[in-house]
Structures are given as C-alpha cells and as structure tokens.
Curated annotation (Swiss-Prot):
This is Small ribosomal subunit protein uS7. Belongs to the universal ribosomal protein uS7 family. The lineage of its organism: Bacteria, Pseudomonadati, Pseudomonadota, Gammaproteobacteria, Aeromonadales. The gene is rpsG. InterPro entries: Ribosomal_uS7 (IPR000235), Ribosomal_uS7_bac/org-type (IPR005717), Ribosomal_uS7_CS (IPR020606), Ribosomal_uS7_dom (IPR023798), Ribosomal_uS7_dom_sf (IPR036823). HAMAP family: Ribosomal_uS7_B.
Amino acid sequence: MPRRRVVGQRKILPDPKFGSELLAKFVNVVMVDGKKSVSEAIVYGALDIIATKTGKEHLAVFEEALDNIRPAVEVKSRRVGGATYQVPVEVRPVRRNALAMRWLVDAARKRGEKSMAQRLAGELLDAADNKGSSVKKREDVHRMAEANKAFAHFRW
C-alpha cells in the first residue's frame, strides 16, 4: 500500500428538489443498477407520502428517523493470541450516516407494502417514532458493544 497522500472524501452535490446533501446520499443508497431517476422517484414519493400522512415537514421526519438509527458504537473483530475478540469502537460520523441509511433501506426492502415508496415511507415513520427494524438493528449493535465492553482496552 503506497504511503502517499490521503485521498479526501468526494463532495456530493445536494439533491435538486430539497437542496440536502444527506438526501442526495440517501438517493444514491436506494439506487440499484445505476438507475438514479428511479431511486429519486422512490425517495421523493416516500417523502410525499410522509407529508400527507403526518402533515410535518418532509426533511424534518427524514432527519429525525436517521438520528434514531445512527449507531454511536459498533464492534470490530480483533485477533489477540489465538482468540478473536469483539472490540467495541466508536463509529466515525461519515460511517454513522452510511450505516443508518443502509439499515433503513434494508429494513424497507423487507417490509410488506406494495411499492418501495410505501415501504420506505413506513420505515421512515417507524424510525422517527423509535420503532421498526432499522431501530432494532441499531439497538442490537449497541447491545453487542455493551456486552463486550470488557474488551474495550484492545483498541487499536
């Protein structure tokens, strides 16, 4: 691995409708096979469903849902001597967002509603209310970190 300069994070353009970089990133996470227009239609459709159901601001519900899903700590495998330990480590801010979005989309895909926009809207609303599969996933990760707190001194 070359020890040259560290390549910086690429700047993502804000989405055209709401001007949010976070939402633009989320559209990219929802995207499958490079079909961005389809993923934009799904995300914007889900936000419209949320606005009609709750009467709240679209982005406010989206932000609240992501806040409830973002993990603070996670476990990483660390091999010491012949044993592998699950070591709790703090999650970097960029990875927090990435994990939250990935878990949200995965949970939405497993739901039973007809269209993906409806599934995504349902999961976003559940996450905003601290319910749903994506919030459960975050709780499981936190529980794993809590259970392995004794190995925190194996940090790297």
